[in-house]
Amino acid sequence: MSPGQKEALPVADRTPPLGVEELHALVAAGDIDTVVLAFPDMQGRLQGKRFAARFFLDEVLEHGTEGCNYLLAVDADMNTVDGYAMSSWDRGYGDFAMRADPATLRRLPWNEGTAMAVADLAWEDGSPVLAAPRQILRRQLERLAGHGYTAQVGTELEFIVFRDTYEHAWDANYRGLTPANQYNVDYSVLGTGRVEPLLRRIRNEMAGAGLTVESAKGECNPGQHEIAFRYDEALVTCDQHAVYKTGAKEIAAQEGMSLTFMAKYNELEGNSCHIHLSLADADGRNAMAEGGGMSDVMRHFLAGQLVALREFSLLYAPHINSYKRFQPGSFAPTAVAWGHDNRTCALRVVGHGRSLRFENRLPGGDVNPYLAVAGLVAAGLHGIEQRLELPEPCPGNAYTADFAHVPTTLREAAELWENSTLAKAAFGDEVVAHYRNMARVELDAFDAAVTDWELRRSFERM
């Protein structure tokens, strides 16, 4: 390194996994015959179409395709529901345009002869669909860029593997399934070896899809595992997260197995999705590090996280099941607190120098990464713009200390979100109303459901 040369912040290769010209060549050679074009919906699931590869190149890549706008206005079961301003029976359930982002082209090794691109959504006049998760994140990243920073993000998804097919799991009402491990295999090389054929295939095929694989390890709940990927720019990471989550399920199904990312499958440890974030400045340096510690930028950014955390919890924990993770002593947070390498806090500061970053420990495996990262960026920008002071860290057990509490139910989180002036200022009234309605729809469905717990409690004895 020559004198005066900047030390670059290490990031993953940003070269698109598959270029347009390379795709043309693969299609001409007959190696690719199908292209998936998909966008993340409100739950972070990929929705879209499969195209003949030649038609995709000749028509769709330049002009886009259409999709019914109800795809951002349905419940998790794809039922039409009331309350969304952008899409309804009264508005005729028209279309929006799905426009491929060429930078997201990649092969899908688990689907023979298949490539994929992620789409952005636009209305007929070309204006973006504001409630689309990818657009929500783009808007916050543009705001961050206005301050001279880019967000570097990594997500850590946990999942539980079962030796049952998805079809059997459905028929069994998702009860009585056989986990791939019989006991806690956290960090166990022996225990994870039993699931290694599946985990190895997932790792290798994700690498073939352009993701940079780091490692895999066992977790605490029987059958629970985690595969880690290298961090990257925020939008790239969120796209990769969505591809990985879908692809892992497809690969498991092909192997006659199933896996779940739901936040709390049973009364044991839940599936987390800790999100790590750092900021890079225009020179590629870690803007959060200064003089062997945290910079003022990081302190303000982290202070913003604390101020907004309760009001933005809907973005980090979007479902009823999400809130069942938040139990004392569970490694899932209950306290709105931060600490140095302290896993009892909602916000954990880790790393040193150029690797210095913070981790938000609220999200579970059911998180929509686009919305969660948008929330992290918006909260941090509030801290920077208001120059918020960071309180002292929690030095011990945040579970038993006197801190504000993470919301304990989706209902509480939805009310905080709906009444948040900070959320409305950062995201706009349309987005706040849209995702408040998403929570209302889920709450109404749950309130009307008769649960197994009620049957066991009341069938004979009441």
From Swiss-Prot:
Mg(2+) 1 binds at residues 156, 274, 359. Pathway: Amine and polyamine degradation; ethanolamine degradation. Residues 30-126 form the GS beta-grasp domain. It holds the Pfam family Gln-synt_C. It comes from the Bacteria. InterPro entries: Gln_synt_N, Gln_synt_N_sf, Gln_synth/guanido_kin_cat_dom, Gln_synth_cat_dom. Gene3D superfamilies: Glutamine synthetase, N-terminal domain, Glutamine synthetase/guanido kinase, catalytic domain. GO terms for molecular function: acid-ammonia (or amide) ligase activity; ATP binding; glutamine synthetase activity; ligase activity; magnesium ion binding. One of its GO terms (biological process) is ethanolamine catabolic process. Binds 2 Mg(2+) ions per subunit. Disruption phenotype: Strongly delayed growth on defined Evans agar supplemented with 25 mM ethanolamine as the sole nitrogen source. Growth defects showing no mycelial growth, only swollen and sporadic germinating spores in cells grown in defined liquid Evans medium supplemented with ethanolamine as the sole nitrogen source, but normal growth when supplemented with ammonium. Inhibited growth in complex medium supplemented with 25 mM ethanolamine as unable to utilize ethanolamine from the medium. Its cofactor is Mg(2+). Its EC number is 6.3.1.-. L-glutamate binds at residues 270, 325, 343, 361. Mg(2+) 2 binds at residues 158, 219, 226. It is an enzyme of class 6 (ligase). It catalyses: ethanolamine + L-glutamate + ATP = gamma-L-glutamylethanolamide + ADP + phosphate + H(+). Keywords: ATP-binding, Ligase, Magnesium, Metal-binding, Nucleotide-binding. PROSITE patterns: GS_BETA_GRASP, GS_CATALYTIC. Modifying the binding affinity of this protein via protein engineering could make it prefer ethylamine as a substrate instead of ethanolamine, resulting in efficacious and sustainable synthesis of theanine, a major aromatic compound of tea, highly valued for its beneficial properties. Induction: Expression is induced by ethanolamine and by N and C starvation conditions. Low expression in low ammonium with high glucose concentrations, and in high polyamine concentrations with sufficient glucose level. Transcriptionally repressed by EpuRI. Very slightly decreased activity with glutamine synthetase (GS) inhibitor methionine sulfoximine (MSO). Involved in the catabolism of monoamine ethanolamine. Catalyzes the ATP-dependent gamma-glutamylation of ethanolamine. No activity with polyamines. No complementation of the L-glutamine auxotrophy of an E.coli glnA mutant. Enables survival of S.coelicolor under high local environmental ethanolamine conditions. May play a role during starvation conditions to limit intracellular ethanolamine concentration, which in excess is toxic to the cells. Belongs to the glutamine synthetase family. This is Gamma-glutamylethanolamide synthetase GlnA4. It comes from Streptomyces coelicolor (strain ATCC BAA-471 / A3(2) / M145). The lineage of its organism: Bacteria, Bacillati, Actinomycetota, Actinomycetes, Kitasatosporales.
